[in-house]
Amino acid sequence: MRSKTRITINSQTPFIRFKLGYFELVEKYGKLSDPMNLDDLHRGVDYELSPGGVTSMIYPLLNELVKENKIEIPYWISLGPNAPYNVKTGNLNLINISLNEKDLPLYTNFKEGLWRELHLQGPMDINPDEYEAFTKYNWYCAKKLFQVLPQTDLYFVHDFQQIQIGNLIGPSAPTIFRWHIPFKLDNISPLVRNFILKNVSCFDAVVVSTRRDLEGLVRAGYHGKAFQLYPYTDINKWKKPSRGKTDAFLSRLKIKKSDKVITIVARIDAIKSQDLAIAALSQIRHKFPSAKLLLLGNGSFTGSRKGGLAHPKSKQWKDKLLSYAKELKVEKQVIMPGYIKDEDLATAYSISDVIVVPSRIEGFNLTTIEAWIHRKPVIVSTGAGSSELVVENMNGYVFDPNNHSELGEKIELLLKHPEAAIKMGEQGYLTALQSDINRAVKTVTAIFDETLQAR
């Protein structure tokens, strides 16, 4: 048996999102190497790291596995519209898949419909052309996976967009499917339910984020190998911001040091339910007239026009939030600066009095862990998977996402009692230690080994 496992990752969202297309890069730099070396480009100008929980978990995990000599430098195959085909960066070999101009929006519509139904937002319309584009995308990924098969011992496939990969790959190599969104098939259409269950059953093993989702997997009739692993983060990557950075951040967002700051870190998407926090803010605004609601984040890979899928849902939701804030007369208290870098995100956590995770339904949400790393109290919707880690009145609060008044009451409690909030944040930090990447490395390595040995 090899001392190092050869891993190939497959996800829809790429680790790198290019702001310039391949031909724009050629025009700017002349001849590019093949594979293209990311060190030859400029971060923030030519490319950026894709935001989101999936990519922020995968990359640190791969780095740690390489450092510990558990795996060889892996391949990562993902969807990269107009991106260079082969990219080399650090411990990664990136391969980008493209869809043509006709198929890309069709693929996007199908996977968005599937996403909405799986998040209980209503039944999807099955359009044959959209399904064909979705299947084409999965087949293009499978073809690239076959191409790197001689350098692969194990495929590690991420999230629902890749659901057909296990069926397409078949018995060629062990394949683990990491499902990141809620696995609750009880209230979806039989057609979609069967589609999900049949395809999930084609993988050698499935990993879900929460106990809720593991129970949902079993309840749906899945009989294969299944694991539950809470999402994780690298605790050591977070550094305390300097006073100068903090002052500059406050000044840029026009927040006073005396203001009470309620923060949500999430992409601008209806499923993140920022509207509940706006309603809660209106409920407490007379008691805390200087309170600010800080909504950090912009669109996802799906909504990005540069290097993404250009779906309009992010802009539509942002417009609704701004309109709702105006309707409730709290528009001057709601701050939406868009995407911010990790170093600014650490500053945002540091100035916050409370972190809210209001999602009506969500797979997990790493914001809960990140807030605890910064010793901040959290208020988490019972619809978010991370609520499983919240012990009421110890490391935070939970609330019913159908009751924004409960959210408002719990925000008020924390703002009124800052000493209790500090104690909650300290307890939260102890909880966050359980989600450190070093623990995850051991668990993931064990899952890899068990799956390989079963073959």
Residue ranges and their predicted role:
Residues 406, 413, 420-434, 446:
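A short, well-ordered alpha-helix in the C-terminal region of glycosyltransferases
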Residues 392-393, 397-404, 413-418:
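Conserved acidic donor-binding segment of nucleotide-sugar-dependent glycosyltransferases
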Residues 256-272, 278-281, 294-296:
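Conserved donor-binding/catalytic core segment of Leloir-type glycosyltransferases
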Residues 305-340:
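Nucleotide-activated donor-binding/catalytic signature segment of Leloir-type glycosyltransferases, i.e.
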Residues 347-352:
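Short alpha-helical donor nucleotide-sugar binding micro-motif in glycosyltransferases
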Residues 360:
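Aromatic "clamp/platform" in nucleotide-sugar-dependent glycosyltransferases that forms part
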Residues 239-255:
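A short helix/loop element that forms part of the nucleotide-sugar donor recognition site in Leloir-type
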Residues 368, 377-380:
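Short hydrophobic beta-strand element within catalytic cores of glycosyltransferases
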